[in-house]
């Protein structure tokens, strides 16, 4: 196996989405995949454009957003290593509904739509995993709608910080926000000014400590009370 194909196979094997695939199926996908190395600020795809396939993020960070003709935009999701972009559009064969842009130098694999769907047709377990992943995305969007519609901005900030801290482990230790505070604010449907004000209030309450993009949850119980 060529070095490039070996690296692609290893990247696919690490991603949760492809865990149901046997080595031979992974190797076939890797053979059809294209490796991309993109600088920070590069667009992968734009809303309304044809979807060439599924992007698997190997390293880096990607922002998914929607925009209005007047220039306003809303961050939908931040994708980290092991995540993917374009699954729904690739499966349905429809144009992209979001714009994807790298927030850091990023390495990705592009799996063409035809190769992805052929793999699903040949591997029922993988097809079920695609259905499960699309279902998780729907549940996530419903949770977002609930938060944006029924939770205060303060509750959204507290909930996000608890979720971020939980990903960093049980002990209180600094965790780094995955993007600039203005981008996090947009993800939570808040203005940057409001997001900063909520951070200062939580600092004053002794719930968190902030050092740039590093945040330490000092009092999880107090933060949980704020998130409900």
Regions found by a protein language model. Name each.
Residues 17, 42-104:
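Cyclic nucleotide-binding regulatory domains
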Residues 65, 87-88, 118-119, 160, ...:
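Residues that scaffold the ATP/ADP-binding catalytic core of kinase and kinase-like folds
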Residues 103-105, 121-192:
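Polybasic "coupling" helices that flank or enter modular domains
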Residues 77-139, 143:
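Cyclic-nucleotide recognition modules
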Residues 20, 78, 110, 178, ...:
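Short aromatic/basic micro-patch
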Residues 23, 59, 81-84, 105, ...:
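ATP/adenylate-binding site constellation spanning eukaryotic-like Ser/Thr protein kinases
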Residues 1-39, 84, 89-91:
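Cyclic nucleotide-binding regulatory module and flanking cytosolic helices
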Residues 162-228:
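Phosphate-/nucleic-acid-contacting segments
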């Amino acid at each position: 196996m060529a070095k490039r194909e070996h690296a692609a196979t290893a990247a696919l094997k690490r991603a949760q989405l492809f865990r149901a695939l046997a080595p031979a199926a992974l190797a076939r996908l890797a053979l059809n995949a294209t490796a991309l190395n993109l600088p920070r600020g590069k667009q992968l795809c734009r809303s309304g454009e044809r979807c060439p396939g599924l992007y698997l993020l190997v390293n880096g960070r990607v922002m998914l957003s929607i925009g209005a003709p007047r220039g306003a935009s809303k961050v939908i999701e931040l994708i980290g290593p092991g995540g993917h972009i374009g699954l729904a559009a690739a499966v349905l064969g429809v144009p992209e509904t979001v714009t994807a842009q790298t927030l850091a130098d990023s390495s990705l694999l592009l799996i063409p739509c035809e190769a992805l769907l052929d793999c699903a047709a040949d591997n029922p377990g993988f097809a079920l995993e695609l259905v499960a992943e699309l279902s998780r995305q729907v549940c996530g969007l419903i949770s977002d709608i609930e938060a944006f519609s029924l939770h205060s901005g303060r509750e959204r900030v507290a909930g996000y910080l608890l979720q971020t801290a939980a990903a960093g482990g049980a002990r209180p230790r600094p965790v780094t926000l995955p993007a600039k505070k203005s981008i996090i604010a947009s993800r939570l449907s808040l203005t940057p000014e409001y997001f900063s004000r909520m951070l200062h209030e939580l600092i004053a309450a002794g719930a968190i400590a902030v050092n740039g993009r590093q945040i330490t949850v000092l009092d999880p119980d107090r933060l949980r009370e704020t998130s409900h």
